[in-house]
Amino acid sequence: MTTDVAPGTMENETSKVMSLKHKAAYVPPPIPHVEMNQLPLSLLLRNLTVFTAKEISQFFKLNVHTGGKTPFEKKLELLNMILFLRNQFLKLYVLVKWAKTLKQNNFHSLIDLLNWFRNANMQVNNCTMALKQILGTMAGAKLPNPDLATSLEVLMLGRPNLPNHGFNLNGSQSDNLTIPNKLILKRLRDLNTCLSIKISLMTIPSQLAKYEIKDGRIVFTVKDEFELQLSTIDQNSPLFFVNINLLFNERLPLNLARLEKHINEILFKSTNPLCLVYQFLHKYILTLQMYMIHVELNALGLNGKYSGGHLVHNYDSKKQIITIKYWLQSKIANTCKCVVGMDKETESIVLEWQNPDVNKETVTTRYHGLLNNIESIIDEITFNHAQMIRADLLRTDTFQEDNEDTTSTSLLFQIPTTCATVSQIQLKIDQVSGIFYFHNPSNLLLSYARQINQSSNTQDLITVLGRLKLDKVDSILRHMLDKTGWICSDVVRLKSSIVPSTDSTFSKDIFVKLKDWPSNWFLVLTIISSTNTCIVEKRIGKILSVKGVWKLKYMDKKNVITSKLDTMTYPKMLTLQISILNKIVNHMIIDSLNELKIKNKICTFTTEDSNILPPYIIRKDGKENTDNITVIALGLESFLEGSKALNTILESSMLLKIDYQKMDIELYGKFKTDNEMIRCQCDELSIKFLEEDSLSFFMSENFGNLNDIMLYLSKFRKKLTQLIALTDVMDTLHSNFQSMDFRVVELRPNEIRFKYLPMKDSPDNEDCVIRIVTNQEKVEKLDIKLSEHNPQAMIQRFLDEKEGFAHNFIFHYLQFTLPLFRASKEADYTSSSPSTVKMHLFMHSLQEFHFLYRNHKVGGELSFIIQLRSVVRTRHQENTQYFVRFAQDYSQPQLQQQHPLSKAIAEIQKNAFSLALLKEQNSNTTSSTTTAGTATAGATMISTASSNKLLDLQDSSPTNAAVDWSSIKCVRLGSALACSHDQILPLLLQFHKSISDC
C-alpha cells in the first residue's frame, strides 16, 4: 500500500522540525522550584484564628486587675488590638483574592521567580564584597608618591630603570653580595651633610629644637612625648619617616604603617612640614595619653583602691574629655567632680577639680603629669575635700579637734551618758567613699550614721547630731523614770512638739504618769537640747485620742518648771511623785471647770492672797501645812448656770478647798444677808454653818479616788442648787405668810411642808407641800400641793391646769384670797346663835369667785360675783383689789320687792353701793377715788403677767369683833364695789349679817 505525498510536503515538515530544534537549543533553563517554607491555606487560617483567640483571651485576663488604667484607656487598647487582628485577616483575604486572579492558580511561579531574583542579588552582593576586600589588601602595593618618570619607564621598558649600585639585578647569582663598608660610611656622611643643609633651610618649631643628626638620619626628641627619626635620599628629595619611639610608654603598640603614611604625606605636601608633623604627633600623643588615663581609671575603679562603685568616670573620645566623679555615696559633698582635658595655654593634659567651695589660693585645683600618677592625685583631692568638710563642721562649734588623730580626718563631739556626765564620740570621714562613720559605734550611733550620710549640707548634719543627742537624753530620762516608778507612755504621739524646734534647738516630749493618776492626765517632760546646753521643762497636760489622733486638750502654760539636765537625779524624781500629784488634781479640776464654762482661779498662799482668803480657810498662825492644800475660787453664777436668785442670796464667788493629806474636799459659800434658811435645819443637805461667820457655810466630802473629785463637785452643785431654791422659797414664804399661824413643819432638800392656817380652819398637819423638781444642774419647777382639808383646796385644780405660775405669785394669791375662804367659818364664829344662812363659795377662775348666801328661814338666795382686778394708783404703782357686785341686777324696784331677801338687798344697796354714803365715808380720799374712777375702763382681770406686781399683803388677825357698815371702807366703781384685802372679809361678814336679819 502506497501513500501519495503532495509535492513539497516532506520538505516543509523537515524545515519546521529543524526550526523547532534550533529554537529549543536557545530555551533558557527553568526557574528552580521552591517548596520550603510553604504552608497550606487551611493551616494558615487555623494558625491565625488560634492566635486571634489567644490574644483576645490574654488581653481580658491581663486587664481584669489593672487598677492604674482608666476605662477609656482599656477600651482604646482593645480597639487597637482588634484593628491589628483585622488587618491580619485582611492581608490573608487579599492574598487569597490575588491568587484566584492568576490563570490556573499558578502563583507558585511568582514565588519561584522572587526566590531566583533574591539569589541573583545575593551573588552580585558577594562579588561586590569580594572586590572591596581585594582593594583593601592591595593598599601596600601602591607607590607612596606618584612618580611619572618611573611609571613611564615601566610602561615603555616593562621595569623601572633604577641605579644598581654594583648589584646584579638580572637575577643571576654573584659572589659579591655585600655592600662595601666604605660605601656605607660615605653614604651616611653624605646623608648627614645633606640633612644638615636641608634642616638649616627649614623652619623648626620650638618643640623640635632639640635634635641630633647621625647615621644618616635626624632624630627629634620632645621630652615626655616622643623621639622621631627622619631621613632623606638626596638634596632634592623630601624628608621621609624612619621610626618613632614613645618616651612615656615604650611598650605601647603602635600602627607604624599608618603613622608612616600620614607623616610622609605631611612631609611631602606641606610647605612647613616640621610644624605640621609636630602638631600631628602632639595631638596623637595627647590622645594616647588620654586613652591611657582612661585605662588607668578603669583599673582603679574596678580592681584598685576605689573599687566598689566609689569612683566612676566617663571618657568622651570625640571631645577628648574625661569626667571623674568620686564619693558617690556622700551627699554632704555637693560637688565631687574632676575633669581631665586639654589645656589650651600649655597644650597639655590637666586635671581640674571643679568645686566652687574650695579656696583656690590655698588649695591646688589644677594638676599636671597625670599619666601613671592619677591615683595619688585623686587621693590628694579627696583628702583636701575631707579637710574642707572638717573645717566647716569645726566652725559650727559643735565639734572639737581630735589632738590624738595624726591623719586629721576625725572630729570629736559630746553626748551625755548620764544626766551628769558626757562622753567624747569620734566621727571620721572615709576618704575613699566619703561617708561618715563612728569609732566603736553602738546601735544608736549606727542608726544615726545612716542619717548623717543622708545629710545634704552641714546644717542637716548638725540637725541629725542634735536629734542624736536628743534621743540619747530621751533614753537616759526614760531609764531614770522607769527605775523610779514612773510609767512612760510610748503610745501617745502629738503631731507637733509642745515647744517647737528651731535651727539651734531640738525638742522632744516624754509623757509620763503614775499608776493611780486620773486617766488621760500626764506629766509632760519637754527636752530642749542645743549644742552646749540641755534643759527639761515639766508641764501638766491632758491628752485624748480623738478618732485615732492624739490631741492636747489642756496644758498648764503658766506653772512651767525648768531644770537643767545635770540637776535631774533619782531622789528628785522620787520627790516629784509626791509634789506633782496635787498639781495634777488641781489642773484636772480646772480643766473640768473650764469645760463646764465655770469661772475659776487658783488661790496661792502668798501674802496678797492670804489677806483675801477668810481665816477659816487657812489658819494664819503657820501651824497648818499648805503644801497639801489647794484653794480654788469659783464664780457662783457660772457654777450654777445663772440662777435668778443668785444676786440676792449668795456672794458672787465660792471657795473650793482640797486637802490631799486628809483626802477631803470642801466647798465654802456665804449668804449676802441674814435669811430664814440660816435658822432652819436640813440634815439631808449636809450643809454646816461656821461659828466664825454666821452667814458662811460649807459642804464637805471625803474622796478615796482622785477620779471621783469631779463627782463630788457635781454633788456640791446639786446641793447648792437645792439650797438656793430652798432659801428663795423660804424667804418668799416668810414674806407672804407673816401670820402667827405660819410655821414650817418639815424641811427637806426637795420638799417643804408648812402650815399657814389656824387649826380651827384646817386639822391637817400641813396645809401645803412644795416639791422642788430639779435635774442635775438646775431647778426645773416647783410643784405646790394643797392639803385635802385646806379651805383653799379648790384652787389646786386651776394651778394644775395651767403650769408656769411663779411661786411668788402663788404664795401671794393664797394669802390674798384667804379671806374669801375664811368668810364662812368666820361668820359662824361671830354669830351667837345657830345661823340660818349658809355661805357657798364657787370658783369660776383664778380671777373670779361666786358667793352664794342661802337663807333657809325665808327660803331666799343672794349671789355676789367677786373679781380680782389690777387698779392703777399712780404712774408707777399698781394695786390689786376685790371688785364685788350682785350676780343679778336689782336696780328695778319690782325685782327688789319680789325677792325674799329684799330687805337685805335694800340694806346692802343703801350701805355698800350708795354714792352719798360712799362720798361721806371717803371724803378724805377724793383724789384717790377720782383716779380710781378714771381707771375703771382700764381695770382688767388679774393674770399671770401681773402676778409679780402684786403688793405685799399682810394677813390680819382673826376677826372676832363685831363689824358694822361704818367700819368698812370701799370705793364705788360703776356697778361694782372695790375694796382691799383688809376690807373683803368684814364686807362679806356684813353681807352675811344683813341676810341673816331678814
UniProtKB/Swiss-Prot annotation:
Keywords in alphabetical order, please. Activator, Nucleus, Transcription, Transcription regulation
Q: Where does the record say this protein resides?
A: Nucleus
Q: Which InterPro entries does the record match to this protein?
A: Med14_N, Mediator_Med14
Indicate yes or no for the key word Kinase. no
Enumerate the GO terms in the molecular function aspect.
Answer: transcription coregulator activity
Chief site of localization: nucleus
Provide the coiled-coil residue spans. none
Q: Name one GO cellular component term.
A: core mediator complex
GO BP term, example = regulation of transcription by RNA polymerase II
Q: What protein family is recorded?
A: Belongs to the Mediator complex subunit 14 family.
User: What's the subunit arrangement here?
Assistant: Component of the Mediator complex.
Q: What does this protein do?
A: Component of the Mediator complex, a coactivator involved in the regulated transcription of nearly all RNA polymerase II-dependent genes. Mediator functions as a bridge to convey information from gene-specific regulatory proteins to the basal RNA polymerase II transcription machinery. Mediator is recruited to promoters by direct interactions with regulatory proteins and serves as a scaffold for the assembly of a functional preinitiation complex with RNA polymerase II and the general transcription factors.
Designated name of the protein: Mediator of RNA polymerase II transcription subunit 14
- Lineage, uppermost ranks: Eukaryota, Fungi, Dikarya, Ascomycota, Saccharomycotina
